[in-house]
Swiss-Prot record:
It catalyses: 2-[(2R,5Z)-2-carboxy-4-methylthiazol-5(2H)-ylidene]ethyl phosphate + 4-amino-2-methyl-5-(diphosphooxymethyl)pyrimidine + 2 H(+) = thiamine phosphate + CO2 + diphosphate; 2-(2-carboxy-4-methylthiazol-5-yl)ethyl phosphate + 4-amino-2-methyl-5-(diphosphooxymethyl)pyrimidine + 2 H(+) = thiamine phosphate + CO2 + diphosphate; 4-methyl-5-(2-phosphooxyethyl)-thiazole + 4-amino-2-methyl-5-(diphosphooxymethyl)pyrimidine + H(+) = thiamine phosphate + diphosphate. Its cofactor is Mg(2+). HAMAP family: TMP_synthase (MF_00097). The keyword Magnesium applies. Condenses 4-methyl-5-(beta-hydroxyethyl)thiazole monophosphate (THZ-P) and 2-methyl-4-amino-5-hydroxymethyl pyrimidine pyrophosphate (HMP-PP) to form thiamine monophosphate (TMP). Keywords: Magnesium, Metal-binding, Thiamine biosynthesis, Transferase. This is Thiamine-phosphate synthase. Mg(2+) binds at residues 74, 93. GO terms for biological process: thiamine biosynthetic process; thiamine diphosphate biosynthetic process. Pathway: Cofactor biosynthesis; thiamine diphosphate biosynthesis; thiamine phosphate from 4-amino-2-methyl-5-diphosphomethylpyrimidine and 4-methyl-5-(2-phosphoethyl)-thiazole: step 1/1. GO terms for molecular function: magnesium ion binding; thiamine-phosphate diphosphorylase activity. Belongs to the thiamine-phosphate synthase family.
């Protein structure tokens, strides 16, 4: 799982400023993302279940083509219906115990955490495959984001002996990703660093190899 978290792209139709979500996703897959989470939320997102399912299936097919895990944000019913590779939920989404009861053994389970105690609880549950920690930096992609934690939270979680795979979340781009990895994350998740880039190949190359020339 750790290797799959290296460059973890998150997006929904609301994040796309040029082209289409499938078009941007395929470019990112060609460029080397290691995981994709379909997150359809907020202003400008698809509103009907049928639209979301149709888009999810199109994205899932692209991920399968490039052998990259396809994860759905929050929508357990949709993830189970289409056989997603994983489900990711936040502290305020569907209760994690309910998600575990529905999904354990069928797909990977990811959980967002914002503190050492939440990370410890995720590990104690035994069925969470990885945790998303953040927001590390200020983010424009999530209107209801928690307060910014900085990279210190990653160091604190690792010092506490928590061994779950970690992906850093929130305001991460090719210029600051090295800090996130150095602090203890196994990978970085990005939205706008890819969706708002004119050259996602360069961005993803730098995310995979921090410090490499663009």
């Amino acid at each position: 799982m750790r290797a799959e978290l290296a460059v973890y792209f998150i997006a929904g139709t609301q994040d796309i400023v040029r082209g289409t979500l499938p078009g941007v996703l395929e470019e990112a897959l060609k460029a080397g993302i290691t995981c994709f989470q379909y997150r359809e939320k907020g202003v400008g997102s698809l509103q009907t279940a049928s639209e979301r399912k149709e888009m999810a299936l199109e994205c899932q097919q692209l991920c399968a083509k490039y052998q990259v895990p396809f994860i759905i944000n929050d929508d357990v019913a949709l993830a189970l219906e289409i056989g997603a590779d994983g489900i990711h939920v936040g502290q305020n989404d569907e209760g994690i115990r309910q998600v575990i009861a529905s999904c354990a053994g069928k797909m990977k389970i990811g959980l967002s955490v914002h503190s050492v105690s939440e990370a410890a609880e995720a590990e104690r549950l035994g069925a969470v495959d990885y945790i998303g920690v953040g927001p590390i930096f200020p983010t424009i992609s999530k209107a209801d984001a928690e307060p910014v934690s900085g990279t210190a939270i990653l160091e604190e979680i690792r010092r506490a002996g928590i061994k779950l795979p970690i992906v850093g979340i929130g305001g991460i781009n090719e210029k600051n990703s090295a800090e996130v990895l150095t602090a203890g994350a196994d990978g970085v998740s990005v939205i706008s660093a890819i969706t708002r880039s004119d050259d996602c190949y360069s961005v993803i190359k730098q995310l995979k190899n921090p410090g490499s020339p663009s």
